[in-house]
Amino acid sequence: MAEELYTSGQYLEENPAWHTYESPWKIAHILPMLKKHKLEPRTVCEVGCGAGEVLRLLQGHLDADTTLWGYDISPQAFEMCKERANERLHFKLADFRREQDTPFFDLLMVLDVIEHVEDYFSFLRDLKSRSQYKLFLIPLEISVQGVLRGKIFIQNRNRYGHLHHFTKETALRSVEDLGYTVLDYAYAPEYEMESKVWQTNLMKLPRRICFACNQDLAVRILGGCRILILAQ
């Protein structure tokens, strides 16, 4: 079962920081999307919140009365969340889909989660009625460069548990096919983040230059990007 990767402690061994270093970058893309659509959520939930760092950072940009909840199935991630909890930031070790007593949230965030879920169609279908707005962050791993390298898909499967791979078009279509209305989307280029991987750093300049010229073409050919989708 895919869930064992996250509940057994194996994922923490492979990723001891649980991607907290990516959280400021994610916030830098989430906030402009909320501002653009004049969204000021008073209740926020993140499904698959990991260490809870995104919620902790987001809380500092929202109204002081905003209530935030984070759910994750990993006991190890939940332990990391505990040190970030406060009066209005709560975390729960649970599968959000099986929770029946949750409120209807203003905003539900699913950030870098869909690619990990065995049946992401049922997963997305179960979330649709749980909030007014949704934010999905999905890695776009299918690119010419990725296909030519070949091994990247298996490497991401082994280390990160990525079971599914997307292009911009398949990510948007997957959301739409399940009855969501896509209100907006934006690319989130990974070259903005620091990296200790030399191959990633080598690709930063060409990705940045190509992205400035033609975003769609750059992502299709060179990859290294995610898509942030706002939906209802």
What are these regions (language model features)?
Residues 126-130, 137:
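Conserved helix-to-beta-strand junction in the class I
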Residues 109-116:
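Short catalytic micro-motifs in class I SAM-dependent methyltransferases
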Residues 1-104, 111, 121-126, 158-160, ...:
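Conserved N-terminal segment of class I S-adenosyl-L-methionine
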Residues 14, 137-162:
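Short, glycine-/aromatic-enriched active-site segment of Class I SAM-dependent methyltransferases
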Residues 117-118, 131:
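Helix-to-beta-strand junctions that scaffold the AdoMet/dcAdoMet cofactor pocket
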Residues 230-232:
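Short beta-strand-to-coil "C-cap" segments at the C-terminal boundary of structured domains/repeats
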